[in-house]
């Protein structure tokens, strides 16, 4: 079982992804949900997290700002974004994968 967190500033995106994961990915346990990078840092500091579903474009710090903290761990990142121009940057940041919003269930299962 993988312990995962969802990080996204949009309530609808967070709840939609949570629902998709709960209904379709029985090997993933959602250990927390954050609406900002600072909340994600707090979750990472207090939980053993295997996987992060991380939005890129958020107010304040963006998803890429969290990467330096994650790189020193074995935590994998799947970026979620509505902007396909971030795909190359996500790959260069050693993301496990990236998903374009709205998230397609088949793409989620492949990631």
Predicted regions and their residues:
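CheY-like receiver
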Residues: 41-111
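Extreme N-terminal starter segment of soluble prokaryotic enzymes
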Residues: 1-4
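Conserved Asp/Asn-Gly motif in the active-site loop of CheY-like receiver
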Residues: 31-40
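Conserved sequence signature across two-component system core domains
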Residues: 7-8, 34, 52
């Amino acid at each position: 079982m993988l312990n995962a967190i969802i990080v996204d500033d949009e309530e609808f995106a967070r709840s939609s992804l949570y629902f998709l994961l709960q209904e379709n990915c029985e090997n993933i346990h959602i250990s927390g949900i954050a609406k900002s990078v600072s909340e994600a840092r707090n979750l990472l500091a207090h939980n053993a997290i295997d996987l992060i579903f991380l939005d890129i474009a958020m107010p304040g710090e963006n998803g890429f700002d969290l990467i330096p903290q994650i790189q020193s761990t074995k935590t994998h990142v799947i970026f979620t974004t509505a902007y396909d121009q971030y795909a190359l940057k996500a790959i260069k940041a050693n993301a496990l994968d990236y998903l374009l919003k709205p998230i397609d269930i088949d793409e989620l299962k492949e990631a």
